[in-house]
Amino acid sequence: MIQLQKPKLILENGLRTDGRKLDELRPIKIELGVLKNADGSAIFEMGNTKVIAAVYGPKEMHPRHLALPDKASLRVRYHMTPFSTDERKNPAPSRREIELSKVIREALESTILLNLFPRTVIDIFMEVLQADAGTRLVALMAASMALADAGIPMRDLIAGVAVGKADGSLVLDLNEQEDMWGEADMPIAVLPSLGQVVLLQLNGFMTPDEFRRAFELAQKGISSIYALQKEALKNKYLEYKEE
């Protein structure tokens, strides 16, 4: 059996393998209203990770007996396209995709005002077009932006980032190498204006002090992401006004 040797993640000049500083985000691009047949849609890119999200609804639930009397039902599908990774994947939903659909749905339920739309359903589809670490968070943010594009009332947008440990150092917004070879990976998503955490997972090990510093580092990154999200919505609104 071939033993793969762990690559050096932090170079001698103190930078990461992709040239970023330890506390630097990957380039972010957000595009709204990309699908004409959806009620709301968005493409969210973080580095080489790219996700498209589409929202349909609120609409009447079929069959009707499944409708909830006091709020809307939320159906969420997270899916990685067969061409999203180096190795072609089976198009059938994997256990990981089913689990992440559930995790993302629970995070979205904390912000959507579902009680305003009883007996209806909102469908959210997320397709990972390119995967290079952080797909669950990018998918969650793409869904949040698509919901805003659809005009569905929310308590706040969701912004998130992963903080990890690579070669003993805390790093913001992991790339694929750091995700694969790092000692820890902690994705965090929040409702920034409310300071409410809606997703927090830790894979690997951090000391209590590292956890505290990682959380502070994540908050710094989330603040920058939230500003870009609001800017994208503002630009979309200005486009509508000009039309």
UniProtKB/Swiss-Prot annotation:
Role played: Catalytic component of the exosome, which is a complex involved in RNA degradation. Has 3'->5' exoribonuclease activity. Can also synthesize heteromeric RNA-tails.
Main EC class the enzyme belongs to: hydrolase
Gene source species: Sulfolobus acidocaldarius (strain ATCC 33909 / DSM 639 / JCM 8929 / NBRC 15157 / NCIMB 11770)
Self-association state and partner proteins as the record states: Component of the archaeal exosome complex. Forms a hexameric ring-like arrangement composed of 3 Rrp41-Rrp42 heterodimers. The hexameric ring associates with a trimer of Rrp4 and/or Csl4 subunits.
GO MF term list: 3'-5'-RNA exonuclease activity; RNA binding
Gene this protein is translated from: rrp41
Protein name: Exosome complex component Rrp41
Keyword Cytoplasm found: yes
Cellular component GO terms held in the UniProt record: cytoplasmic exosome (RNase complex)
Similarity section: Belongs to the RNase PH family. Rrp41 subfamily.
Gene3D superfamilies: GHMP Kinase, N-terminal domain (3.30.230.70)
SUPFAM superfamilies from the UniProt entry: Ribonuclease PH domain 2-like, Ribosomal protein S5 domain 2-like
InterPro entries membership: ExoRNase_PH_dom1 (IPR001247), ExoRNase_PH_dom2 (IPR015847), ExoRNase_PH_dom2_sf (IPR036345), PNPase/RNase_PH_dom_sf (IPR027408), Ribosomal_Su5_D2-typ_SF (IPR020568), RNase_PH (IPR050080), Rrp41 (IPR011807)
GO BP: gene expression; rRNA catabolic process
E.C. number: 3.1.13.-
Alphabetical UniProt keywords: Cytoplasm, Exonuclease, Exosome, Hydrolase, Nuclease
Subcellular location field: Cytoplasm
